[in-house]
Amino acid sequence: MSQISKTHSRLAGRNAKPFDLKNITNDAVASLRRIGLVFDHAVVQDQIKALAKAGAFRSGSAMDSNFTAPVTTPSIPTPIQFLQTWLPGLVKVMTAARKIDEIIGIDTVGSWEDQEIVQGIVEPAGTAVEYGDHTNIPLTSWNANFERRTIVRGELGMMVGTLEEGRASAIRLNSAETKRQQAAIGLEIFRNAIGFYGWQSGLGNRTYGFLNDPNLPPFQTPPSQGWSTADWAGIIGDIREAVRQLRIQSQDQIDPKAEKITLALATSKVDYLSVTTPYGISVSDWIEQTYPKMRIVSAPELSGVQMKAQEPEDALVLFVEDVNAAVDGSTDGGSVFSQLVQSKFITLGVEKRAKSYVEDFSNGTAGALCKRPWAVVRYLGI
């Protein structure tokens, strides 16, 4: 059975117009974007050239004319920012671990405005002799010295502008809070560095650190000549020799198995404590069994302490944490090292300006003081 063809549209003769494309201008083509019809300029140009080559525009009719193509830059219909998905939060850049507090602790002493911290040292003097009725009485005496450490005050501030704060909020970042946190971290980095290396300002100050206090014993060369090539026996040999040296220096006043001892190692060497014997016993296991009160701490500052033949040398520092007052009769508390800190973080002031506000912060430290050098053993080149 035949079907009647469907008429989709009809245009009367009086309404028919020549196919001249006069009104298809750049603006007309571009305006089609409003209804979702997007024509890529390059694609349209290629189509026009193909039609012209095929003679589509050379019908000989007076109604024919050139097609005016869009001249806008080819683009995608949706800007890229509308096609982005942002992950939550912001990743902050990491800084090296600050380990001075963990290694030697922290003594909060003095005031921020002080100039020096002073530790008194008394050496009793006197030698007994054989008694005699007519001899002179030998008298005891004492000699006092005073170790001075100069206080160094750090400073770090922040300024936040009105426009800056508003624009930072667009990325969900609190500019003032971020800068305030960085001020605290920056001052802690400053204090940690002084705790290890001291501070030299050129003004004759006496501020030293864990690695360069003038009271410290000199570095020694480890028997193994380096852990990177040493086996299990070589590594424990270095530790055993350091402990033996500690006992000798204290003239048997220190029992390494009974006293709290800290073994400070370079970050690049601490993992060599996992070296094992053929029976699976690691260096760490041996330390726990042999010296149960010895703790192990690592720090980046102990790596590359000194250069030798263009090769960095890493350090080992073994020390007793506290000495009992019964050993020497001291009244200072017995610590071997003291980190002399006046203030970790204080607010100096806040200034409100027309378009911004300023905050200033500070801290104070006198570095590290080695009170009992005989309770410290140092190796360089592990």
UniProtKB/Swiss-Prot annotation:
This protein's UniProt keywords: Capsid protein, Virion
Subcellular location: Virion
Residue ranges listed under propeptide: 1-64
Domain of life: Viruses
GO cellular component: viral capsid
Major subcellular location class: virion
Full protein name: Major capsid protein
Origin organism lineage: Viruses, Duplodnaviria, Heunggongvirae, Uroviricota, Caudoviricetes
